[in-house]
A protein has these predicted regions:
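Key residue(s) within conserved catalytic/signature motifs
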Residues: 1-231
Length: 231
């Protein structure tokens, strides 16, 4: 995936990427496996502001020698049916519209998507914010997760794990995928006090107090330090 020609401002996104090298390395290893035809699905959880999107942008912004397909769910009162896959379908070469009259849309589309992904070129497939997903999207994710092991695909599915409910559809899907060999659940933790200190001290901010106020949440840390800079 080619990088954007626009350049971020000073330290943009970087504040959220401290202590993320291990997970970036894990994703790189997963893509290497996928390139050899052994696909996997990474179920990436973390609270709001943990830096999931920043991490995925950093990973996909590298020269991966892979096709990148990116879709996202949106916070709507009526979620878009197969929302993230509407984003993915055209660049993936799948004509989603032809499945619309069929009630088995998720099953039909999942089959078409798997067929398209079963080629010799590796693919990184990102589906963001599935805590807002409709049931059809979750069905496609589940069906893909069951078949991904034989595909040259690294699928990364992100969600807010602090918004899971005991009887929610997403928790059920995550539980079912946990029983497959190719799906792995990973958690993106808050920053440690040491990481917050690395960011706070150059700005003359008390690190312990900032850590206590933000809980190490990268977004809150970033916003607090930006407010100091604005003053």
């Amino acid at each position: 995936m080619s990088k954007s020609s626009g350049k971020p401002g000073p330290d943009e996104d970087r504040l959220e990427l401290l202590e993320r090298s291990e997970l970036l390395g894990y994703l790189a290893a997963g893509l290497a496996e996928a390139a050899d035809g052994r696909g996997c699905m990474v179920l990436l959880g973390g609270e709001a502001g943990a830096g999931k999107t920043a991490l995925l942008r950093e990973f996909c912004g590298n020269d991966l020698s892979a096709r990148v397909l990116w879709g996202a769910c949106e916070r709507l009162f009526t979620p878009r049916a197969l929302g993230p896959f509407l984003d993915i379908a055209q660049p993936a070469g799948v004509e989603l519209g032809r499945f619309a009259p069929n009630r088995r849309v998720p099953h039909e589309f999942a089959g078409a998507l798997v067929a398209e992904l079963a080629n010799d070129f590796p693919t990184v497939l990102v589906v963001e914010d599935v805590h807002w997903a409709d049931e059809g999207t979750l069905d496609v994710i589940k069906l893909l997760g069951r078949r991904i092991e034989s595909l040259p695909v690294l699928a990364i599915v992100s969600f807010r794990d602090d918004q899971l409910t005991a009887d929610g559809a997403l928790r059920i899907v995550l539980g079912e995928l946990a029983g497959t060999r190719a799906a792995v659940r990973r958690h993106l933790p808050p920053l440690s006090l040491e990481a917050v200190r690395m960011l706070a001290e150059p700005a003359g901010v008390d690190a312990s107090r900032l850590f206590e106020r933000t809980g190490g949440n990268p977004f809150f840390v970033t916003e607090a330090l930006a407010a100091v800079d604005a003053d």
